[in-house]
Amino acid sequence: MFDGTETVKLLDELGVTHVVWLPDSELGTWHTALAASKKIRLIRVCREGEAFGIAAGLHLGGARPIVVIQCTGFYEAGDALRNVVHDLGLPIFMIVGYRGYYGGIAGRKDTAATFLEPIVAAWNLTHKLFTKESKLNELASFYRETQEQGRAAAALIAETRT
């Protein structure tokens, strides 16, 4: 999918100050580039629900954080997401790894993929799917558009790893 070094460079150009995350097998490949960044602070969390509270505090303090988690963690973080996005109205941007988008392992369906888009829609969250054909500049445009409009949003990154 998106290369870690190129993604970190883009996030820096977009003015992202913090990446609050609990990585998965696909997005975790960005770790080396994120950890080496001199401008973006990487904040590792134990549970995905923590990521939203931390990102909210950073945002309220004037930072420009994003949350990076896998779809199964997105499910776990529902109440924190609801509070931050809908009750507080904060424009937190999320990158969500879409596990199972390209199928399961050895013919088994990964139900993690079954629920992501319906749940994102149920949360009334602006979102966009990024597949292996997508370009990094499309992610940049989506980020800029939603931040300029003051809306929380989720970039759903179709994972090619299982």
Residue ranges and their predicted role:
Residues 1-162:
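Thiamine diphosphate
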